[in-house]
């Protein structure tokens, strides 16, 4: 659990009235207001703060949306045979449009290598 604190008494005078976020699960403290000897946003072991007394500071925590290594899905509702036939007979499919990396493109405008790649990665045996 994260707790916001203001140090009210400490063996190290530089810590007086400084603000920190304490992570009780990790045993870490993050400096919110920089003091001499500590950089703003620095994370240290709680033991590095030494003997301290503090008062808890009410915190309003808003959910943070984080996107890390997200997924991208392009849905093309076609049969594999249709794309394979479009490779062999592009004149029969001048308007065949697919989604690639979020963009709509004409299948026939792709290079043969790109067409093979689309066919190979679009169709799977099972999900």
UniProtKB/Swiss-Prot annotation:
Alphabetically ordered keywords of this record: Organic radical
GO MF term list: formate C-acetyltransferase activity
PROSITE patterns the UniProt entry points to: GLY_RADICAL_1, GLY_RADICAL_2
Pfam family membership, one: Gly_radical
Domain Glycine radical per the UniProt entry, residue ranges: 5-127
Protein function: Acts as a radical domain for damaged PFL and possibly other radical proteins.
Organism of this sequence: Salmonella dublin (strain CT_02021853)
Location of Glycine radical modifications: 102
GO CC annotations on file: cytosol
Gene3D superfamilies: 3.20.70.20
Disulfide-bond pairs as recorded: none
Listed name of the protein: Autonomous glycyl radical cofactor
Alphabetized InterPro entries for the sequence: Auton_GlycylRad_Cofactor (IPR050244), Form_AcTrfase_GR_CS (IPR019777), Gly_radical (IPR001150), Glycyl_radical_cofactor_GrcA (IPR011140)
């Amino acid at each position: 659990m994260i707790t916001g604190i203001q140090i009210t008494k400490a063996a190290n005078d530089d810590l007086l009235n400084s603000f920190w976020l304490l992570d009780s699960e990790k045993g870490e403290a993050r400096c919110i207001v920089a003091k001499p000897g500590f950089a703003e946003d620095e994370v240290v072991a709680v033991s590095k703060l030494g003997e301290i007394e503090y008062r808890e500071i009410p915190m309003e925590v808003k959910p943070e949306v984080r996107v890390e290594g997200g997924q991208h899905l392009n849905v093309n509702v076609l049969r594999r045979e249709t794309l394979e036939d479009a490779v062999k007979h592009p004149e029969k499919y001048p308007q065949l449009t697919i989604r690639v990396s979020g963009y709509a493109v004409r299948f026939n405008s792709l290079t043969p290598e790109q067409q093979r790649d689309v066919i190979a990665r679009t169709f799977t045996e099972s999900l």
